[in-house]
């Protein structure tokens, strides 16, 4: 019988689910495992600068390709990744965290090994990860190891949550039957309970029949749990007005004639706020009702006719249907409503915000102007990444072309996340279409947390756009508290020296301080082509911020001060 090592089995399985790049760092408990990656055609080891950045990169990759894998070493390595893994858990991103752990015999003898706490407890780090993992596995028996690997990959993909997999150093070189690879991992969702699903569909159909002014509200999990196609069909079939939340940016086509804008509670444009809150039926798809996603919980629906479609349950008014998955329920709903909506008379959606006329070329750059004009630079198929802070709020003012995907960590909000996410997303984009552009907007403060990963981009010849918004410090924190506090200040960097410092040869750097310089640069044909890595420093006033961020900061400060 043909056999392969357990380590090679893992990478063959990852290759089969199109997870072709693995992130992480080498450590003595995973070195033998990493040897096996190079035995599998088409697999790539990213080789990150540190484990936290690797976790961020795995998150960015998974958002584009459906799942990812990070490999760390026991203790010191895995713990360094946990902030990033927690963010993936919070934001519904499927990351398989493989940890190389000491051999089974070392654990049994409770040896006082390096990277331990010195107390003989080899399960403590596994237990730490359990609360931010959908499931965990610590392989102890080669006989069931392939099945456990398959289970972990399946769970990562189908639940869109991180999964922890511990692989002892002595097991990865042991053999397992190669024939197991002939049976693909089943990545399909289990069907809904037919009776519960039918009741959901019947109830929603009746609500739609009675509605005169329904709206669709697309949120984060419309993207994360793969119902973008179903959401588009629902838009096309019903012609209901459609809105997105900040976390829902990119979930629908913003060029669709029924698209009405971004709903953020009291932070919404007045006409958007009125349209959503006056609806008599709200079909909410994939909601994550966090503070920054809802304008500090300021939703003010006038109707109680709210249907929440989630990945693992559906809520209709006050009734919850556990275990009913939205993907199948939406498909059944689409089959059931053509007759119901045929006489629906479409309600007008709010008019698009017109882009202001050109300003004098020497006008200093401001956030409001930049975000409103950014759509002119974007093109179909772009991946846009916006860092926590001014970028995460400003991007809500930008109307996207068709098929633009957005990565914004609105819920977890770990500053510096997007540098690693840019690496992962760019590697994923390169595997899908080398011409696909990946564009990052990040503040000067956030960049300082994770800047090392730019060197990994250069190492792999990646060609992203990195827009550094230089407003001299942590602007979002200044707006919330301590506008002149020393702790919100940073050391200024020579940003345009970073690419050559990290060893770049084929690169461009630009500094933009006026609207004329912005327009000249972004309209340049060569600049529009992702032929090289680029860093663009955008010079902005110290306290300049999108108006929504100013308002959100006031709400957050008030929340923090409540007794």
Curated annotation (Swiss-Prot):
Its EC number is 4.1.1.-, 4.1.1.43, 4.1.1.72, 4.1.1.74. One of its GO terms (molecular function) is phenylpyruvate decarboxylase activity. One of its GO terms (biological process) is branched-chain amino acid catabolic process. Signal peptide: none annotated. Coiled coil: none annotated. Keywords: Allosteric enzyme, Branched-chain amino acid catabolism, Cytoplasm, Decarboxylase, Lyase, Magnesium, Metal-binding, Nucleus, Phenylalanine catabolism, Thiamine pyrophosphate, Tryptophan catabolism. InterPro entries: DHS-like_NAD/FAD-binding_dom, PDC/IPDC-like, THDP-binding, Thiamin_PyroP_enz_cen_dom, Thiamin_PyroP_enz_TPP-bd_dom, TPP-bd_CS, TPP_enzyme_TPP-bd, TPP_PDC_IPDC. Homotetramer. Present with 471316 molecules/cell in log phase SD medium. This is Pyruvate decarboxylase isozyme 2. The lineage of its organism: Eukaryota, Fungi, Dikarya, Ascomycota, Saccharomycotina. The gene is PDC5.
